[in-house]
Amino acid sequence: MDVFGRNPTAKEGEYFRNNIWYWRPLANLCQSVAPKICAGCEHWQSNDGDGLDAEAALALAAVLEGLLADGTIARMVADRDRYLAGLPDETCELCDGKGVRTDEIAVNAGMDKQVITEEGHPRCGQTGWCNSCDGRGTKRPFLTHYPCDVENVAEFAAFLKSCGGFSIC
């Protein structure tokens, strides 16, 4: 997401960027730790120009900085990482857990004839592959593709301090 400062007072308040994978957990974290402040933005997960005014942005920056300083954000990120690591793999929906796609698109792409040559792969030497699970039949849950880290939260807090309010575009 592209997040633009509405009335920046410093360079770091002009623009903040996260791809959708990083933005979603960051926005969720903000809403979790400061729900009343964040309520001023209804559409955190869309790029329709919604955002917070200058007062709310400064208030959110203060909350995030306090939680960064006392280690709360680091603990939240570590707890989230442990939770995600503990999630079981899911059966791949494209190959029904077989590790081989046989639908028309896959056959046209030659996936049903592809030999797996990667050493250490559980199906090494076998014919047939799935591009969704790398021919394994299972894959990590979709939620695990959304990273969250302390550095990203700190960068967003720095943006918030000098953005003069922001719009998510």
Segments from the language model and where they lie:
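Acidic (Asp/Glu-rich) sequence patches and key acidic residues
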Residues: 1-169
